[in-house]
Structure formats: C-alpha cells, structure tokens
Curated annotation (Swiss-Prot):
PROSITE patterns, sorted: RECA_1 (PS00321), RECA_2 (PS50162), RECA_3 (PS50163)
Keyword vocabulary terms for this entry: ATP-binding, Cytoplasm, DNA damage, DNA recombination, DNA repair, DNA-binding, Nucleotide-binding, SOS response
GO cellular component: cytosol
A molecular-function term among this protein's GO annotations: single-stranded DNA binding
UniProt name for this protein: Protein RecA
Provenance organism: Bartonella quintana (strain Toulouse) (Rochalimaea quintana)
Task of the protein: Can catalyze the hydrolysis of ATP in the presence of single-stranded DNA, the ATP-dependent uptake of single-stranded DNA by duplex DNA, and the ATP-dependent hybridization of homologous single-stranded DNAs. It interacts with LexA causing its activation and leading to its autocatalytic cleavage.
Family: Belongs to the RecA family.
C-alpha cells in the first residue's frame, strides 16, 4: 500500500471515530480565517500587538506591580468589546471592582456579568461554564493571586500547602484551552508579581500561580507605572509603559508608553499626538504642535484640549495613524530592541 492510500485510510478512520473536521489540511481555503481581535483602548498598544488588538479565542495575561493599570487595561478591553455588541463577564476574585470607575471607562454595567467567588475552584468552574456556553466574548479573571484553593481556606493560617495554587491553575488551563478556542472567547488573566528569594543574577520577579499560565497564554503584557502626570502641583495620572513580553501572533518585545488619567482611563488624545509626532503626521516646532498647517496648540496639554474640542481632526489623525501602523510597529520594535541591548550591556 502506497503512502497516499495509507494516509487516506488513516484520515477516514479518524473522521469516523471523532467526526468530520477533526483533522484537515491547514491550507484548506474555507478553514483559513483571520484572527478576530478586540481593541485595548490604546492605539499604540493595538499597533504593538501586530494584529490590531487582543486576540479572541486565546488566553491573555496582564501582569505588573500594584496600581500599575492592570485592571484599567482589562476594563478598557471590556468596554471596546461591548461597543461592538460583545457579551462580557468579570470574575472578581479580589472583591475589589469599582463599578463607578468601570462606568467612567465606558463599561456598560447593565450588560456586564460579574461573579465574586469564595474559592479558586469556584472561580475557575464559573469561568469554564461561561466559556463552554459559547455566548461570552471577553472574560476577565482578577486576579490569579486571589484564586485561593479551597483546602487553603478550610485549613489553619499556618498550614504549609506548597504548589497548591499552581496545580489548580495547571489543571484548569488544561481543561479551558480547547473550550476557549472553540467558543472564540478571550480570557484575560490579571496577575500580580512576587520576588524570588536568593536570586543572584537576572530579574528576581515572577508571577503567581506557577508556570502553566506562561505557557498557555498567547499574549503576555507587562504593565508598569514609570512616572506621574501633574497639573500644577496635583498628580492627575500615571505615565504607563507596556511591554509585549510574549506574542504568538506577531513579533514580541515591542514597548509602548501612554498616559492613564485618574477617573478617565487611557488618554487617547495624548497617544494621537505622541504617535503623530513619531511618524511625522503631527508636526512639532519648538513647543507648538500642528497638523496639516492647522495649529493644535502650544504644549502637549493645549494640543490635547484642541483635539478634545475638535473631534473631527482627532478622527483624521487616528485614521492616518492606522494607515501607518506598519511603520509605527517597526519603530516600536527597533526602540525595544535597542533598550534591551543597553540593559544587557549594563548587566
């Protein structure tokens, strides 16, 4: 029997056993589809991700120090999904979601499903049930560190239960991965960082919940607060840096910076100005900003105010930036590469 007949026989047997479509050629025309994405609320981050946003049908991990903007970024993704008619759910394991802040970011609270589970097992069971339904587009788990195993809750405060949470996450992700892909649901895990003891070389930082999430996640975002935004003497927001640490859909290691304004979320207008200057769409002469010979204002804050009052110009700049997305992505990758080289030389 030649190879072709043997292969046909094997394929027929697989389809009889597991159903039609259980195995196919990757290049079959009807099977090749573009990956659906959901915007992050940050234009520069959408470009850095290479596919225009966070991918549906995949696992995403957002991690960083406290008060760095992890939940804010996840809520922006929920708001963007809801704008397109998506169904979203929020597993609030930390019991710390602020509905007033979520509404300010554009989240439709009336159509957001929320659960505040008592144990890690309960949280992950609810997650699996929602994913298997096939009706949810975005599901956020906040956070992995708060997924406390039932045995730990029932035990004494001083009980040593090493690896319990890691085993819980590993088992849950094994069960969830196939369901997430089939249902085309994006699951965002928010995670915290911890310090490893006795690390002499390299970064001592690690994320909670073991290594399973690092492997199963298609996208991992490291978000950090790198500075403060002041209005006279009052701090009104954070300068935030996000690095795409892992990306299975496009080149990783791109790095972007944007502003998060307290009570407002990600400053879209600030991004339009910064990215516009970077690719030459917005001209900067001294402290003045202009677009198509139209002066936007003196200083970044005045230029932002002008765009706030003239939404049509802001839309024009955004359209032009999206058309130049490839050029911006290359520049982001080069900048991140040079920074990595400098840090390696310093070590």
């Amino acid at each position: 029997m030649d190879k072709t007949k043997a292969l046909d026989a094997a394929l027929s047997q697989i389809e009889r056993s597991f159903g039609k479509g259980s195995i196919m050629r990757l290049g079959q025309k009807e099977q090749v589809v573009e990956i659906e994405t959901i915007p992050t609320g940050s234009l520069s981050l959408d470009i850095a991700l290479g596919v225009g946003g966070l991918p549906k049908g995949r696992i995403v991990e957002i991690y960083g120090p406290e008060s760095s903007g992890k939940t804010t970024l996840a809520l922006h993704a929920i708001a963007e999904a809801q704008k397109n008619g998506g169904v979203c759910a929020f597993i609030d394991a930390e019991h710390a979601l602020d509905p007033i802040y979520a509404r300010k970011l554009g989240v439709d609270l009336e159509n957001l499903f929320i659960s505040q589970p008592d144990t890690g097992e309960q949280a992950l069971e609810i997650t699996e049930t929602l994913v298997r339904s096939g009706a949810v587009d975005v599901l956020v788990v906040d956070s992995v560190a708060a997924l406390t195993p039932r045995a730990e809750i029932d035990g004494e405060m001083g009980d040593a239960l090493p690896g319990l949470q890691a085993r819980l996450m590993s088992k849950a992700l094994r069960k969830l991965t196939a369901s997430i892909f089939r249902s085309n649901c994006m699951v965002i895990f928010i995670n915290q960082i911890r310090m490893k003891i006795g690390v002499m070389f390299g970064s001592p930082e690690t994320t909670t919940g073991g290594n399973a999430l690092k492997f199963y996640a298609s996208v991992r975002l490291d978000i950090r607060r790198v500075g403060s935004i002041k209005d006279r003497d009052m701090i009104v927001g954070n300068q935030t840096r996000v690095k795409v640490v892992k990306n299975k859909l496009a080149p990783p290691f791109k790095q972007v910076e944007f502003d998060i304004i307290y009570g407002e979320g990600i400053s879209k207008l600030g991004e339009l100005i910064d990215l516009g200057v970077k690719v030459g769409i917005v001209e900067k002469s001294g402290s003045w900003f202009s677009y198509n010979s139209q002066r936007l204002g003196q200083g970044r804050e005045n230029a932002k105010q002008f765009l706030r009052e003239h939404a049509e110009i802001a839309t024009e700049i955004e359209t032009a930036l999206r058309q130049n997305a490839g050029l911006i992505a290359i520049e982001l990758l080069e900048n991140a590469g040079s920074e990595n080289t400098e840090s390696n030389e310093a070590i």
